[in-house]
Amino acid sequence: MSENIYGIHAVSAFLNNAPERLIEVYALKGRDDKRLQPLLNELHRLGITIQFVNRQTLDKKAEGEVHQGIMARVQPAKELNEADLDTLLQNQSNPLLLVLDGVTDPHNLGACLRTADAAGVCAVIVPKDKSAQLTAIARKVACGAAEVVPLIRVTNLARTLRELQQKHNIWVVGTAGEATNTLYQTQLTGGLALVMGAEGEGMRRLTREHCDQLISIPMAGSVSSLNVSVATGVCLFEIVRQRLA
């Protein structure tokens, strides 16, 4: 079993973080791209064979997605679970976690991973059910973050939140449009898990019930909500601002 990744950032990040899992690389024949050439040079330096193919072949392998002239077939990584999360948190003094409840669009998952990496999130937690997979699309949108931010899939999200609270003393903050306390009125400087719900539906009932606090993003215009990846960025960087203050 293998996975495909495509795009300059995604393949480059994979090469930097897990070169041993690269099976084969395909590149567009005759393409003169200053952004692509350093990656091709590094692949050559490491002795990784590149198969140069025409656009029709590469488009077909990338299933019509924008590939920027390169794609790779790779061995899938081991799926991380609750035990891996527990091990990770043992080495964290003031962890920041992102929890995505019911986010099923791989574009949104990739965008959230990219933002999580920029904000210093130590892991992203998702439920095994009703959650986007880490597809080639998600990896490309993540621009390399999918290879460095641990993605933890848990069987029971409510139970995981409870263990974060009781075992690791992490404050669980959920986002909800109707919450009276806003993001900017809330102290978010300690060990924290930020929970983002699906667009339109929000968090599931059990997830909401396991939050220590609910907060909202104040909205001044006529729209009632933001895209989940945009809302995630707004919340995470307010947390970053508070931690740097």
UniProtKB/Swiss-Prot annotation:
One of the Pfam families matching this protein, by short name: SpoU_sub_bind
Catalytic activity field: guanosine(2251) in 23S rRNA + S-adenosyl-L-methionine = 2'-O-methylguanosine(2251) in 23S rRNA + S-adenosyl-L-homocysteine + H(+)
Documented EC number(s): 2.1.1.185
Cellular component aspect of the GO annotation: cytosol
Residues given in the record as S-adenosyl-L-methionine binding sites: 197, 217, 226
Keyword annotations from UniProtKB, A to Z: Cytoplasm, Methyltransferase, rRNA processing, S-adenosyl-L-methionine, Transferase
EC class: transferase
Subcellular location: Cytoplasm
Keyword Isomerase: no
Listed GO MF terms: RNA binding; rRNA (guanosine-2'-O-)-methyltransferase activity
InterPro entries: 23S_rRNA_MeTrfase_RlmB, Alpha/beta_knot_MTases, Ribosomal_eL30-like_sf, rRNA_MeTrfase_TrmH, SpoU_MeTrfase, SpoU_subst-bd, tRNA_m1G_MTases_N
Similarity comment: Belongs to the class IV-like SAM-binding methyltransferase superfamily. RNA methyltransferase TrmH family. RlmB subfamily.
NCBIfam families named among the record's database cross-references: PRK11181.1, rRNA_methyl_3
Role according to the record: Specifically methylates the ribose of guanosine 2251 in 23S rRNA.
Name the UniProt record assigns to this protein: 23S rRNA (guanosine-2'-O-)-methyltransferase RlmB
Organism: Pasteurella multocida (strain Pm70)
Source organism phylogeny: Bacteria, Pseudomonadati, Pseudomonadota, Gammaproteobacteria, Pasteurellales
Name of the gene: rlmB
